[in-house]
Regions:
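Bacterial N-terminal signal peptides
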Residues: 10-19
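Sec/Tat signal peptide C-region and signal peptidase I cleavage site
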Residues: 20-26
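Short A/G/S/P-biased low-complexity tracts
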Residues: 26, 218-221
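Mature extracellular "passenger" or substrate-interacting domains of secreted, surface-exposed proteins
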Residues: 27-197
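Bacterial N-terminal signal peptides that target proteins for export
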Residues: 1-11
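A short, hydrophobic C-terminal helix/tail in secreted or cell-surface proteins
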Residues: 200-219
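Compositionally biased, low-complexity segments enriched in small residues
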Residues: 4, 19, 198-199, 205
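Short, charged juxtamembrane terminal tails flanking transmembrane helices
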Residues: 223-226
Length: 226
């Protein structure tokens, strides 16, 4: 094969690889408080690899963006895979998980009984989750170890029990526990957030701008530390 032929073949190969990579995408879901609404919000970017049964997600506390001044802090994250509920208090079993290293929050993974989901979700049974504080249950939690407004954290979960579920089903099965919710939110100081409607375009623009700003700030901090 001539040089030109090899060059064209190489370019074609790169285009095929690039095209295949472009088809891989993560889902984004928007969480809002069941009782406090825009006082307690989060954006979750999630991705599921069905070949390895591995689920990864990054959650950002956007409460102070959707409601300036909000102090709502994420202290627990749980998933109840469909259908809602389970005969066992621990739901589906066989999952393992961990939080990516973080300087701002400290979540602990659990595949056991995470307790009830308050604020109107009594029928939910969490299959796995991440909690803060000594209680080890979803309804409790430690504000000091949680995710403050503007902060993000990443997690990974794997397990054969994911078999048969789609990325969309898993992403939408999230429950987020908020503590230190402003009383003006109307939920008596705490709340649980679930996936809701897509925010208005103006809100999405603000979220995107804020997340980009946070990323730039983090990169500047890393450069300074180096």
């Amino acid at each position: 094969m001539s040089r030109v032929g090899r060059f064209i073949f190489s370019i074609a190969g790169l285009l095929v690889i690039a095209g295949a990579s472009a088809t891989v995408r993560a889902d984004t879901v928007f969480v809002s408080g069941a009782g406090s609404g825009q006082f307690s919000t989060a954006t979750v970017v999630c991705e599921f690899n069905s070949q390895t049964n591995t689920f990864t997600f990054t959650i950002t506390n956007t409460s102070a963006i959707t409601q300036p001044g909000s102090t709502s802090t994420i202290t627990g994250i749980g998933y109840d895979l469909p259908p809602v509920g389970n005969a066992s208090a621990s739901g589906l079993n066989g999952f393992t998980g961990m939080q990516a290293p973080s300087l701002s929050s400290n979540f602990v993974f659990s595949d056991g009984d995470l307790g009830n989901v308050p604020h109107g979700f009594d029928t939910a049974v969490l299959d796995f989750g991440f909690t803060t504080g000594a209680s080890g249950n979803f309804a409790g939690g430690s504000v000091n170890d949680g995710l403050l407004p503007g902060e993000s954290a990443s997690f990974i979960v794997s397990g054969a029990a994911f078999t048969g579920f789609t990325e969309e089903q898993i992403c939408n099965a999230i429950f987020v526990r908020f503590q230190n919710v402003p009383l003006a939110g109307g939920s008596n100081g705490s709340d649980v957030g679930v996936v809701g409607a897509i925010p208005e375009p103006s809100t999405i623009f603000l979220l995107g701008t804020a997340l980009l700003g946070a990323g730039g700030f983090a990169r500047r901090r890393l450069r300074k530390r180096k």
